[in-house]
């Protein structure tokens, strides 16, 4: 997996765009059982990421669900990790728009369905969400297009690019 680390370093340095990187990372599972990959994603999320969930975000999502809001998770991260993550928030698998590929008879292919990033996030949302988007939350510059289509936009623990854009647009910025 040294090549994957090197490729990720290229992405972090700006040599590879997010759509390409996330597309490559989801297609590399080609030929594997989706059940096996989903279990591995769940174990990874639970052991490495779940403890980093901001309690205030968990509480906010819970309150929004309780008030009847239609909540979607939109991410360029692979669908398997996002499914595992959304279990912690009570968000249905049918409300996930993430990097994904076609699966045939339980086996992952290398045929991309979507990689929602940048403009692709707002396009993916418009394909499935009817009406106006009340609120959107993002943490990187790849979320700007999605944040721009919401009535209320929130930059949560934003990277410097998004923080600058959020200040310029007078969006709410939150650092936990």
Residue ranges of model-derived segments:
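C-terminal cap/substrate-recognition subdomain and adjoining C-terminal extension
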Residues: 30-176
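Extracytoplasmic ligand-binding site segments that recognize negatively charged/polar headgroups
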Residues: 16, 20-31
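Conserved phosphoryl-transfer catalytic core
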Residues: 1-14
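Secretory-pathway/luminal and periplasmic proteins that interact with or process carbohydrate-rich
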Residues: 13-16, 91
């Amino acid at each position: 997996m040294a090549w994957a680390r090197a490729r990720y370093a290229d992405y972090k340095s700006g040599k590879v765009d997010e759509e390409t990187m996330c597309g490559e990372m989801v297609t590399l599972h080609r030929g594997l059982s989706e059940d096996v990959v989903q279990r591995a994603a769940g174990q990874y999320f639970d052991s490495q990421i779940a403890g980093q969930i901001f309690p205030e975000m968990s509480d906010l999502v819970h309150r929004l669900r309780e008030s009847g809001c239609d909540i979607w998770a939109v991410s360029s991260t692979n669908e398997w990790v996002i499914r595992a993550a959304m279990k912690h928030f009570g968000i249905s698998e049918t409300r996930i728009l993430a990097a994904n590929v076609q699966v045939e008879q339980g086996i992952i292919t290398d045929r991309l369905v979507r990689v929602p990033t940048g403009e692709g996030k707002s396009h993916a949302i418009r394909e499935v969400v009817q009406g106006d988007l009340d609120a959107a939350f993002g943490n990187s510059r790849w979320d700007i297009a999605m944040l721009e289509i919401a009535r209320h936009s929130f930059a949560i623990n934003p990277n410097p690019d998004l923080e600058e854009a959020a200040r310029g647009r007078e969006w709410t910025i939150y650092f936990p």
